[in-house]
């Protein structure tokens, strides 16, 4: 059977059940959830005018020279197209230097989104969780930056910090060039999907954590998003319920202290930005409890949170739920919400 996103992500999160075993044993034994009969990747969102091209006209490498913790031999780029011919998805692997792809609206209104695609930290799904985001929100006047972040299992050290380093650095680089991009740096938020939702949640709860040595003046700026959208997110590597099912998703063999540190649901404070969540109740890969626990923790911390939980939708739908699904309205609801919450 052709490899698809849910197979790979399922293997990634399934490995978390074996967190106490060696990395090699985890890799060999990680179960892959069976796909529902007839399942196909979601149809790419293509409004009038067609989708923007990849790569974008403006691509900005985030790190001058080698990124932090680089291996002796950098990963080699390995983009692939996946899924049936009518529903192809572009996946990025082999990320040697994190980069942001800039998508500018015809009439910028000053708002901006850092879009963080998912992929189980094994690839970056830039089609339905990057290009589609740019197309939709550009039409509303929002400048979109799609983050292609380094993948932990491609040789970086410490592996579990590489994505957060990239997310922090992206926020700072964007803010350092706000005038050039015609955005208000105070209106820059983040929108993350699945593993990218984990990274977005990690960013909003660890934006001030020192995870790399400053490299230039941009690193004096804040990495804190003004707001966050978390779409079917993994919100903790160890969940409040005690489940360790996501423990190996980011990097095998992490210590309990590192697992706690990279479990953003446990780190929500009065400083955490407002959040908007979307999660299908029937998601077979990232359980709805991830979002429910986030809401409970946000309420305990007194932080605003809003959510949409369609009964049906599965995982990885991006902006592509069927029109007769009430959850298909989430991009419009989120767009309205962000205008009231800093965007």
Regions found by a protein language model. Name each.
Residues 110-118:
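Short beta-strand element of the alpha/beta-hydrolase
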């Amino acid at each position: 059977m052709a490899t698809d996103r849910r197979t790979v992500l399922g293997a990634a999160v399934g490995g978390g059940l074996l967190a106490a075993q060696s990395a090699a044993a985890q890799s060999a034994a990680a179960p892959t959830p069976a796909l529902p009969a007839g399942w196909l990747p979601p149809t790419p969102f293509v409004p009038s005018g067609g989708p923007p091209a990849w790569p974008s006209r403006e691509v900005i490498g985030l790190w001058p020279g080698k990124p932090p913790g680089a291996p002796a031999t950098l990963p080699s780029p390995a983009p692939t197209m996946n899924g049936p011919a009518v529903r192809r998805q572009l996946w990025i692997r082999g990320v040697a230097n994190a980069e942001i792809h800039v998508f500018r609206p015809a009439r910028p209104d000053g708002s901006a989104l850092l879009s963080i695609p998912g992929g189980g930290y094994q690839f970056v799904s830039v089609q339905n969780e990057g290009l589609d985001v740019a197309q939709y929100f550009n039409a509303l006047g929002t400048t979109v930056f799609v983050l292609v972040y380094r993948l932990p299992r491609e040789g970086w050290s410490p592996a579990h910090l590489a994505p957060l380093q990239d997310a922090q650095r992206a926020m700072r680089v964007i803010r350092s060039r706000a005038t050039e991009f015609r955005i208000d740096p105070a209106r820059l938020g983040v929108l993350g999907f699945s593993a990218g939702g984990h990274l977005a949640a990690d960013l909003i709860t660890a934006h001030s954590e020192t995870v790399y040595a400053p490299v230039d003046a941009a690193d004096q700026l804040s990495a804190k998003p003004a707001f966050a959208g978390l779409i079917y997110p993994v919100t903790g590597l160890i969940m409040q319920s005690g489940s360790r099912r996501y423990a190996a998703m980011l990097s095998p063999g992490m210590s309990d202290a590192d697992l706690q540190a990279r479990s953003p649901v446990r780190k929500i404070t009065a400083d955490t930005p407002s959040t908007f969540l979307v999660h299908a109740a029937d998601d077979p890969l990232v359980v709805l409890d991830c979002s429910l626990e986030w809401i409970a923790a946000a309420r305990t911390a007194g932080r605003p949170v809003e959510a949409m939980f369609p009964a049906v939708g599965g995982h990885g739908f991006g902006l592509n739920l069927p029109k007769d699904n009430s959850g298909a309205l989430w991009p419009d609801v989120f767009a309205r919400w962000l205008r009231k919450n800093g965007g």
